[in-house]
Amino acid sequence: MNSKIYFDNNATTQCDEHVIDSMLPYFRNNYGNPSSIYSFGKEIKEEISKSREKIAKLLNADKEEIIFTSCASESNVSAIMNAINNNPSKKHIITTKVEHASIIETMKNLETKGFNITYLSVDNKGRLNLDELKESISDDTLLISIMMANNEIGNIYPIQEIGQIAKEHNILFHCDAVQAVGKVKIDVKEMNIDTLSLSGHKIHAPKGIGVLYVKKDLHYTPLIFGHQEKNKRGGTENVPYIIGLGKAAELLLEEETEINTRLEFLRNKLEKEIKENITDVHIYGDLENRLPNTSSIAFKGIKGEEILLVLESYNIYVGTGSACNSELAEPSHVLVACNANLEDYSPIRISLGKYNTEKDIETFIKILTNVVNMLRSLKDNKNGK
């Protein structure tokens, strides 16, 4: 097999050709510093402003509420530290057991500094219990930080309800929307979100660019000091990547509905045909409320890593969980939180993207069926069956 089938779009996405084309002039000719007072710099600053407007529109935000960062992890940490700076007398934060590593690891670090962190549990389908959230709130709570959609199992969480709970208790609400942008309709005003993080490389823009939305009436103390971004994020602006991210947002506004309808069709076709061709299959997550492109699927008796490695020999690429944890020999913290039987059902994560086709699905099903049957046969022979 020569052509590549890439089914790991929750890890990263291919940069859109239109995005690349929009960026190139800012590498070659339009390389001025946007902080310069001469026209060569001012023109660049105006283009940055246009990108800011496009991203704001994607979130139903105002452009003044958009801060460019280097990545979503920076945005996440910035949002958390700002909440702490805004509430110096409080020491309690509420998050979940299934957040991205940049949230979880920041919370662990804060625990060493005397903060009290509540990690909300999930059920075996990865669903939150909002009663547990309400019961966890105290007078000492300074922040609720909950993701909009999970990167491993695809669950979409009830952000509007969570935002309302936070608002009723006058608690800041941060949302990691990295996996949701482009797949879920986001309205920061309607959802009562105070701060929100997103990443360029999950929406066909380049790696190395992110956004932090900060509600305009919220006092903001930067993580990185400097005069750029109206004193909210220091460092010379990454102009080409900002332009590329703006173009990606523009494309999403045009294509989002059509792409998601097609991705959901392809994902459902994939799962249906897998279950028709392979026995003892388990799909993780909330199947009624999940991203249209994501399937966390396991095959009894076969490790997800084993399937991944054999598929790679066919030029097919899937994930086994978060790409940010893939080098660690540890089980997925998300699936552990779901009380998953990882000994028998260790999953692969299939996350489709806009460049995947129905032919990709058909080719994948044939090869996957053979791979699973082969691995099971080898295991049976080893066990003397």
Place the predicted regions along the sequence by residue:
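Pyridoxal 5′-phosphate
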Residues: 1-385
